[in-house]
Design a protein with these regions (language model features):
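Structural signal for the C-terminal ends of transmembrane alpha-helices
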Residues: 4-14, 19-21, 91-101, 161-169, ...
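Aromatic-anchored segments of alpha-helical transmembrane domains
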Residues: 36-38, 114-120, 183-193
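Alpha-helical transmembrane segments in multi-pass membrane proteins
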Residues: 108-112, 116, 120, 206, ...
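Interfacial segments of alpha-helical transmembrane regions
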Residues: 23-30, 88-117
Length: 248
């Protein structure tokens, strides 16, 4: 095993800081699809629902028994309010290896979520798409329709959970977290269609926005835990090396 590079951070850390072409391509594709969907909605007279929107909306209205509607409301509630921020902070804390790293990672995860929320809010106000008719709603909703706030928020939190699991969990636990996070985010988004407060294209826009934003951020930062850029060695072997170098 090669010794740490005395001239700077270890080679692994320098490689982690490089942008991933794959992540950049995913971010570009998601951004392009989001832009195409937004332009399509804006060019429709009155920002009316797209053909697929109306068909799925009508299906939801005719398949809403009380039990499923109540369950959908409960699941949707987990994607708004304080819950997403608590989950994001928890995900960030799990990515650290000690108290300091857990604190910094939790704050970084919250910052990523808040920045994403600000971007979503700005786009929602700029697009200003009306929601489905109020008579079709089976829950409370506010604001404009696109992109869906619940869908974007839950997808952002799911992405942060997947990032945390990739850095701080064993393989089996990692796959469990990834699966649960994706299923939860998808479920929250679908409830917004089922409850009649969003068009399907609103939910798709939220997913695309979250995916594009997170993959672009991961490409820029190398997807590393934020504390990796701090001037402290990542492990005891590197700390011993620096202590020896300083004594010399």
């Amino acid at each position: 095993m090669s010794a740490p590079d005395p001239a700077g951070p270890p080679r692994e850390a320098r490689r982690a800081r490089r942008s991933s072409p794959g992540q950049l391509w995913v971010a570009a594709v998601c951004t392009a699809l989001f832009a195409a969907l937004t332009i399509t909605v804006l060019t429709v007279d009155g920002k009316r629902p797209l053909p697929g929107d109306q068909a799925l909306h009508t299906w939801a209205l005719t398949h809403r028994p009380d039990a499923l509607t109540a369950a959908a409301r409960t699941l949707a509630d987990s994607g708004t309010g304080l819950w997403p921020y608590l989950l994001a902070a928890l995900a960030g804390s799990l990515a650290g290896r000690n108290a300091r790293e857990r604190t910094v990672s939790a704050v970084a995860a919250l910052a990523v979520l808040l920045l994403g929320q600000g971007l979503r809010q700005a786009l929602m106000l700029a697009i200003a798409r009306p929601r489905p008719p109020h008579a079709d709603w089976a829950t409370h909703a506010s604001g404009f329709s696109m992109p869906s706030g619940h869908s974007t928020t839950s997808a952002l939190v799911a992405g942060l959970a997947c990032w945390a699991a990739a850095h701080g969990a064993r393989r089996i636990l990692r796959w469990c977290v990834w699966g649960l996070a994706v299923v939860w985010a998808a479920g929250v988004g679908l409830t917004r269609i089922y409850l009649g407060v969003h068009w399907p294209s609103d939910v798709l826009a939220g997913w695309l926005l979250a995916a594009g934003y997170l993959t672009a951020l991961a490409a820029v930062t190398g997807g590393r835990v934020p504390v990796a850029c701090a001037p402290f060695p990542a492990n005891s072997r590197q700390r011993r090396h620096l202590r020896t170098r300083d004594m010399g």
